[in-house]
Amino acid sequence: ALADQSYCIGGPEASESCEKLLREYPSIDFLLRGEGEKADLLFFEAAENAGCDLEKIKEAKPLSMSYFLNGKYVETERVPLIENLDDIPFPYTHEELCGLKERILYYEGSRGCPFSCSYCMSSLDKKVRVFSVERVKKDIDEFLSAEVRLVKFVDRTFNFDKKRTYDLLSYIMEKDNGITEFHFEISLWL
């Protein structure tokens, strides 16, 4: 790590063992917990308001963060989960997508998992939250229009809802452009 740099990390794995991670890696200044669409935004707002002064950011105690302040571990209140995933904007412009044609794009049509496997972090959510079928179809249209080579759905269990799965797979087959491929994680016993 560069001594004159500030480090902020996040993500599902980091969100569940915060204090341990911060103790093991003292070069990390902040650990963002929860969904990045909210936690990251809160961090950047706090940083802007504090003039990017690390101590001022910590003193402001922004939500969904873990850090050490004066040698004491601090974990602020976590922001609630995003209930309506359709509120999250599509992350790309058409031009950006066209520039990613030969890349693999990871896409999330749902969050969570219907199972409660003790070894898996996805069991922490306890329920599945979804982007609406209409929203996913609109996003698929964007991928097809840009001729993205491969879209990997990172949904923990894409086929947890048979009707939804049928609707989306039928749509993909109907709109097939002969270029874009789709990848899904499914459970065979559903």
Where are the predicted features?
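Short, solvent-exposed loop/turn segments at secondary-structure junctions
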Residues: 13-15, 36-39, 81-82, 114, ...
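Glycine-rich beta-alpha loop elements in corrinoid/cobalamin-binding modules
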Residues: 1-78
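A generic "functional-site adjacency" signal
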Residues: 34-37, 82, 103, 130
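Generic secondary-structure boundary/loop-capping signal
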Residues: 11, 19, 62-64, 79-87, ...
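Pocket-edge positions in alpha/beta enzyme catalytic cores
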Residues: 32, 77-80, 126-128, 157
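Radical SAM [4Fe-4S] cluster-binding motif and immediate context
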Residues: 86-190
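Active-site donor-binding loop signature of nucleotide-sugar glycosyltransferases
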Residues: 34, 67, 78-81, 90, ...
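A generic structural signal for short, non-catalytic loop/turn and secondary-structure boundary residues
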Residues: 58-60, 81, 100, 177
